[in-house]
Amino acid sequence: MANPSSFLLKRLMSITGLLPVGGFLVQHFFSNSYVFISPEAYNEHTKFLVSLPMVVLIEALLIYFPILLHAVLGVAIIYRGENNFTSYSFFRNWMFFFQRVTGFLALIFIATHSYTTRIKTGLAGEEMTFNYMVDILKQPLWFWFYFVGVLSAVFHFCNGIWSFFVTWGITVGPKAQRVSSAMTMGLFVVMGIWGVGILLKFA
């Protein structure tokens, strides 16, 4: 019989990863895709988002708190020895390893990106514009930091969907899990190209 606390931890982990954190990532990609239209369209959309009522409270409750909770739950699961390299295939064990690594990298990236584009600009009274992002991403070190960060966040989200399906009993057999793995890795490729494409428009 499963440990009740372990059962709860895994389900909280999967929910906070898929819904608020994953939802934010997808929404972020859609919002930044205005850059494909024009710099002006990107600036207008960014200005609209920043002007939303209680935007700071919304970000705190729907973005930053869930991400922090997801990170804490992840550390708790690793500390308890959950999801070790024992019960799955060689490939899936490596996916668990990369899930942990990309989770750590994504957390650093999200924290840095949030500080750079929200906190720093807010304290300085600056606007987060197309040119602001260009000034950041034209610097090679920053570009590669964003490149690794975006791909880490995308992998963590997509591979997390596979884990979500297993955790909630949606994919229970080996065949279903193989199909799910192929689908989520396909999603990783699509979203990875999407995210890198956005970065290149700024760079």
Residue ranges and their predicted role:
Residues 1-203:
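Membrane-embedded alpha-helical bundles that constitute the cytochrome b-like, heme-associated redox core
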